[in-house]
Design a protein with these regions (language model features):
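Small/polar loops that bind or transfer phosphate-bearing groups
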Residues: 20, 71, 94-95
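Short, polar loop motifs at secondary-structure junctions
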Residues: 23-25, 50-56, 97-103
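Residue-level signal for pocket-adjacent positions within structured domains
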Residues: 27, 53, 119-122
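Terminal domain-start leader segments
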Residues: 1-49, 76-87, 108-114, 148
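Compact, glycine/acidic-enriched structural inserts
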Residues: 50-81
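Flexible, acidic/His-enriched mid-domain "rim/lid" segments that flank
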Residues: 2-4, 76-148
Length: 148
């Protein structure tokens, strides 16, 4: 099961969408690391929002996500567009990775109920699949050669 599919499997109960704001969860779900952004994951579709510095890389590397540039528009409007387009009413979020000010902004501006969901979202990252372990082995071999 790919990482995005794992996130999608969380959508059968309490929430019908996930708001991924931490770099760790975005990297895990998209299987590609982009320093800035946010993502919404729903069964109806997945969108990844980032700015123009990363847009080309995101468009070329993010499988399973529609990539949207936030420049000149802003995250809240685009997130609300996704919430409306995908019919999201209850959005799970990563409370461990938001400041109080960020959470207050999301609560004020997003058109969906926000439900703390960090435990569920981050739970998958601790268990590695064979392909992830192989990538870690290759990275370690490269590091070993660099220091040899």
């Amino acid at each position: 099961m790919k990482n995005l599919d794992k996130y999608l499997s969380l959508l059968d109960g309490e929430v019908d969408g996930l708001l991924l704001t931490s770099r760790y969860s975005r990297h895990y779900g998209a299987e590609f690391d982009i320093a800035e952004g946010a993502a919404i994951v729903t069964k109806a579709g997945c969108r990844y929002f980032t700015d123009s510095r990363y847009i080309e890389s995101a468009q070329n590397n993010l499988k399973g996500f529609e990539v949207i540039c936030v420049d000149g528009i802003g995250y809240f409007k685009l997130l609300n567009d996704a919430i409306a387009d995908f019919g999201v009413s209850n959005l799970g979020y990563e409370e461990a990775y938001l400041t109080v000010a960020e959470l207050m902004g999301y609560e004020k501006h997003l058109n969906a109920k926000l439900t703390p969901f960090n435990k569920e979202i981050s739970g998958f990252r601790g268990v590695k699949e064979d392909w992830e372990l192989e990538l870690m082995r290759k990275a370690q071999q490269i590091a070993d050669k660099a220091f040899a």
